[in-house]
Amino acid sequence: MAFNHKHILGIEQMSAEDITLILDTAESFKDVSLRSIKKVPTLRGKTVINVFFEASTRTRTSFEIAGKRLSADTVNISASTSAVVKGETLEDTAKNLEAMKPDIIVMRHSCSGAPHYLAERCDFSVINAGDGAHEHPSQALLDLLTIRQKKGHIEGLTVAIIGDITHSRVARSNVYALNKLGAEVRLCGPGTMLPPGIERLGAQVFDRIDDAVSGADVVMMLRIQQERQGKTMLPSLREYSMFYGLTPDRMKLAKPDAIVMHPGPMNRGVEISSAVADGPQNVILDQVENGVAVRMALLYLVSGGEKLEDSAQ
Amino acid sequence: MGKSETIILDEAAISRALTRIAHEILEHNQGTDNVALVGIRTGGDHLALRLQSRLQDIEGVTVPLGTVDITMYRDDLASRGSLPVGKTDIPFPVDGKRIILVDDVLFTGRTIRAAMDALMDIGRPRNIQLAVLVDRGHRELPIRPDFVGRNVPTAASEQVMVRFDDQLRPVEVCLSKP
C-alpha cells in the first residue's frame, strides 16, 4: 500500500490502512535504534526544521533524533529564539522558512489549526507536533505502536483514557486512532474536564475512574496541565488525586495483564502514584522509545508522499 | 502492445545452478568456516534459504542465514517515493564473517551497493562475496559477482523476473520484452 499524504496534520484525516502502514514502517525503523551504528542514509540531503512555539523536551528531542538517525539535517527553532517574539506573524515566519528551502517542517503551536494554516500556504511537508487542544498525531501513533507491541493487536481492546480531556490533544488523537483500528475507548475525568458532546468522537464517557478502569486492557493517564487550569476546574490537586489518581488498588480493577501508559511528563502523586508509575505494568519508557521510531517513519513517509500524489494523477 | 515473455531458466535449471553455486562457495572459501549467507529482500532471501539447504546437503553444516532489507539505503527516494520498509534480520554477529550476499537478478549494481552499506552499518565482515542467480549486465557501479547462475545478455528496456511458488521455491526465470 502506498502512503500518499504530503502532510501529517492529524489522525482524523488518516485511514486505518494509513495508520497500520505507519506502525509497520516504525517497527522496521525501530531496529535502527538498537544497533551500534544508529544511522541510515535514507533522508540524506533533506532538511527538517523543528519549529516549536510551545515548550517541549520529549517531542522535540524525539523528532530531532529521528531526523538525525535518517541522516537529515535538522534545525531547531523555539518561540523564545524566533522572530515571533519580535512581532512577526506566523505566515511571515513560514514564508521566511520556506525561502530557506526546507523539506519538512515539524511544528508545535498553542493555536489549534496552526500547522494546517502553514500546510495550505507553503510547499514543504508539515508534521503536526501538537496544535493547541486539537491533535497530537505522533503521540497517538507511538501509543498505538506500544499497545500493539504489548498486546499483539489493537482491535477489540478496551482503552481507558483518564484526566484532563478538555485540554488534551493526546486524548483526541488517540480516540480517533483507536476507533479507526477497532478498539473501545473510554474517557474519564471530572465534569469540568470533559467537554460537552465529547462522546460524539466515538468514546464512552465515565465520571468515576473505578468504572472506567474496570476490565480495561490499557489505562492511559493524562497529565494535569497545571499551566492551563483555571481556578474553576479543580478545587485542589489533592482532591483530584483522591478521586482520579491511578493507584495500585484501582489498577486491580483492570484486567490482570493491563498496561499503564502516560504521555509524560508525569505529575507523580497527582494523576498517577509512584507505585503505579514505576510498577511492572507501566510501559511509559517503551512509549518514549517507540516515539523515535514512529517519528522516523513519519519523516520517511512524508518525504515520498508528494511524489506518490504526483504519480497518482 | 503486449509484452512477450521467454523462460530462460526452468525449475530444474535453477536447481542445477544453485547446486553449482553452492559447490563454488565451498571451494572458494575452502569449506564453511565463518561463512554466512545474507539474502536481499525480496527474492534473494528465498534463494539464500535454498543455498543454505544445498550447503547443508553437501557439507553437513548449517551456515548462518540472514536477510537484509535495503529500502532505507536506496538512493532513489526522490524519484520513487517512500516504498514500504521491510525488516532486516541478521541473527548472528557479522564481525569477521565471510558474508555471501545473495540476490536474484544483478542489474545496475545499486541494490548491491545499498546492501553492502546496510551490512557495514551492522558490523565489519571479513569480506563480502556476491552470489546471483542471473547477471543481466548494465552495471552503473563497479560491482562484479563472485558466483553467477546464468549470464543473460539483455537490453536495458527488457525485464528479468525470478518467479517463486507458494513455498517460496524458485520455479522459473523469465525475460520480458516490451
Swiss-Prot record, chain A:
* The keyword Transferase is annotated on this UniProt entry: yes
In this chain, carbamoyl phosphate is annotated as bound at 58-59, 108, 136, 139, 264-265
Coiled coil segments of this chain: none
Q: Can you name the source organism?
A: Syntrophotalea carbinolica (strain DSM 2380 / NBRC 103641 / GraBd1) (Pelobacter carbinolicus)
- Write down what this protein is called: Aspartate carbamoyltransferase catalytic subunit
Q: Which gene encodes it?
A: pyrB
InterPro entries recorded: Asp/Orn_carbamoyltranf_P-bd (IPR006132), Asp/Orn_carbamoylTrfase (IPR006130), Asp/Orn_carbamoylTrfase_sf (IPR036901), Asp_carbamoyltransf (IPR002082), Asp_carbamoyltransf_Asp/Orn-bd (IPR006131)
**Could you confirm whether the keyword Membrane appears in this record?**
no
User: How is the quaternary structure described?
Assistant: Heterododecamer (2C3:3R2) of six catalytic PyrB chains organized as two trimers (C3), and six regulatory PyrI chains organized as three dimers (R2).
